[in-house]
Amino acid sequence: MAYQTVNPANNQLIKTYPAHSDADVEAALQQADALYHSAWAKGDIEPRLAVLHKLADLIDSRVEDLAKIASQEMGKLIKQSRGEVKLCAQIARYYADNAKSMLAPVKYPSELGEAWVEHHPSASYWRWSRGTSPITS
């Protein structure tokens, strides 16, 4: 079954997307797992933070375009869509600016010697978004 984006304001079809087969989903999961085990994921965090900064910059540079798409696809007021698009950029920038310190080991005092908590990824993360929020999810 194909998926469609329909403008809720006028019920006009915006775009049709093909359905994914089981093989498509399996290939995507394998690709995500390969990336999770790659040098990119296990290596220095700086290149990934640079990607988040670039994402924030790209979103900021296209607020109007992205807001128009969101309004068309979800029937939102353009002002609300602009706010959501800007929030997406702010979230990406927040993590780009703070992830390194947030993920740094935290030392705790202990009478038994050194103690600390380290943060390590445990799996790929997939999020299925609501069908009514294609841009912000």
Provide a role label for each language-model segment.
Residues 106-137:
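Conserved small-residue-rich beta-alpha loop and adjacent elements
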Residues 1-113:
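N-terminal Rossmann-like NAD(P)+-binding subdomain of aldehyde/semialdehyde dehydrogenases
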